[in-house]
From Swiss-Prot:
The keyword Glycoprotein applies. This is Matrix metalloproteinase-27. Zn(2+) 1 binds at residues 165, 181, 194. A motif (Cysteine switch) lies at residues 89-96. Its cofactor is Ca(2+); Zn(2+). It comes from Tupaia belangeri. Matrix metalloproteinases degrade protein components of the extracellular matrix such as fibronectin, laminin, gelatins and/or collagens.
């Protein structure tokens, strides 16, 4: 009886603490939202009480503005997706106000830059290389040139700073949060670019890539505003990409060339199309789909074709099957009606019985995508639930193949719905109950029911390629858990074990 009473009191103690904890969490979230919207969306609150009707309606309006910019469901409330965006590391330049449009650029093409100080996180040579490559990202698509100087005033003054710094009207907030900021072309602070020294700067993707953040900030220093295109380098939130890959989207290129124009055109000898090799260790795919008892892997103008029960691999031109389809497809999947849908940009084609159906291509927006979605990165249909997942940037949509409508509650962030696979997906398909997600030269075998990765492999393991010694990627993926939210699960498990231990100890005490 005593042990039961103690257990009851313990339960009441934990239960009574929850409302207070929830209230405190709500207050912290509201303070976070106010600071975020004030910094990036020009929110001006009168007084300190957000519950006032005037301030409340103003806050709701700014939340809606922010949700619309990031492509979230516009509710005006601080839902979990909105808070998650607000907590994501990002650029310190506002999303609205004077930065709402592309700004006038420099009135010259030959610009100078100077690195005022260096971060101790990286070797000086690595910092120099990251800055140089970040500037080259923009010079490769414009007539701009960049020359490094070692003294005097440069057009772009580069510095690593912390918190409140010098004459700069912007400040840093310590680790995470704001990573950097830059000022548009002009006199004084114009072109100046600052990075938060409290961050962990790296030359790869282990911490925050200086190359990627610098390339983004230099976009501002050249006159670009933020983009709501989630694939764009000028998207305000930090997205980890392979630094060896070219980071500009067409949206970035169009923006910078609208200010400075494109590269001068010079006649060049045309090069033949590159033919992909199945056993290339860095092989990536544009799209993958089941097609009855086959799987097709698309790359450029070509496709590989394998059968579920045959080890042979066929390599063909896409045009040899479907002359009307374009090259460089971006997504594909087989629906429950044995139709294949293939996607490129804002269009999709439907294939039945190996023939492209008439009246195609059609717009992806008839499937229920909002107008800001310009392309699909990957798609896969769960044949058990008849639900299709579409991957767009860092988000996934779910489509009901029976009602032919998008499911409510979507889009959701990929890292929350499919923990462990990372931020983006290049291609996907289903095989023997597992999803296979492809990102770069890796593929993730994913248990749908357990919501966990079972294996990580190279992309071309389907092609019977001989693995070089020590090349297996089938390992314990602790780093992938950083994306998965499994830390939260482990926390709850630990809390449960702690409570169980306390109760067990109290029972032993009462028995004496």
């Amino acid at each position: 009886m005593k042990s039961f009473l103690l257990l009851f009191l313990l339960f009441v103690t934990f239960s009574s603490a929850l409302p207070a904890d929830q209230k405190m969490e709500n207050e912290e979230n509201m303070q976070l939202a106010q600071a975020y919207l004030n910094q990036f969306y020009s929110l001006e609150i009168e007084g300190s009480h957000l519950v006032q009707s005037k301030n409340g309606s103003l806050l709701d309006g700014k939340i809606r503005e922010m949700q619309a910019f990031f492509g979230l469901t516009v509710t005006g409330t601080l839902d979990s997706n909105t808070l998650e965006i607000m907590k994501t590391p990002r650029c310190g330049v506002p999303d609205v106000g004077q930065y709402g449009y592309t700004l006038p650029g420099w009135r010259k093409y030959n610009l100078t830059y100077r690195i005022m100080n260096y971060t101790p996180d990286m070797a000086r040579a690595d910092v120099d290389e990251a800055i140089q490559k970040a500037l080259e990202v923009w010079s490769k698509v414009t007539p701009l040139t960049f020359t490094k100087i070692f003294k005097g005033i440069a057009d772009i003054m580069i510095a690593f700073r912390t918190r409140v710094h010098g004459r700069c009207p912007r400040y840093f907030d310590g680790p995470l949060g704001v990573l950097g900021h830059a000022f548009p072309p002009g006199l004084g602070l114009g072109g100046d670019t600052h990075f938060d020294e409290d961050e962990n700067w790296t030359k790869d993707t282990a911490g925050f890539s200086l190359f990627l953040v610098a390339a983004h900030e230099f976009g501002h220093a050249l006159g670009l505003s933020h983009s709501n295109d989630q694939t764009a380098l000028m998207f305000p939130n930090y997205v980890s990409l392979d630094p060896s890959k070219y980071p500009l989207s067409q949206d970035d290129i169009d923006g910078i060339q609208s200010i400075y124009g494109g590269l001068p055109t010079t006649p060049s000898k045309p090069k033949g199309p590159k033919i992909p090799h199945a056993c290339d260790p860095d092989l990536t795919f544009d799209a993958i789909t089941n097609i009855r008892r086959e799987v097709m892997f698309f790359k450029g103008r070509h496709l590989w074709r394998i059968y579920h029960d045959i080890t042979d691999v066929e390599f063909e031109l896409i045009a040899s099957f479907w002359p009307s389809l374009p090259a460089d497809l971006q997504a594909a999947y087989e629906n429950p009606r044995d139709k294949i849908l293939v996607f490129k940009d804002e269009n999709f084609w439907m294939i039945g019985a190996y023939n492209v159906l008439p009246r195609y291509p059609r717009s992806i927006h008839i499937l229920g995508f909002p107008r800001y979605v310009k392309k699909i990165d990957a798609a896969v249909c769960d044949q058990d639930t008849r639900k299709t997942y579409f991957f767009v940037g860092i988000w996934c949509w779910r489509y009901d193949e029976m009602t032919r409508t998008m499911d409510r509650g979507y889009p959701q962030r990929i890292v929350r719905h499919f923990p462990g696979i990372g931020l983006r997906v290049d291609a996907a398909f289903q095989h023997k109950g597992f999803f296979y997600f492809f990102r770069g030269s890796k593929q993730f075998e994913y248990d749908i029911k357990a919501k966990s990765i079972t294996r990580i492999m190279r992309t071309n393991t389907w092609f019977q390629c001989k693995e070089p010694l020590n090349s297996s990627l089938d390992f314990h993926f602790n780093q992938e858990k950083a994306y998965s939210g499994e830390v939260e699960t482990l926390h709850h498990q630990s809390l449960s074990l702690l409570i169980f231990g306390i109760v067990h100890l109290l029972n032993k005490i009462c028995s004496y």
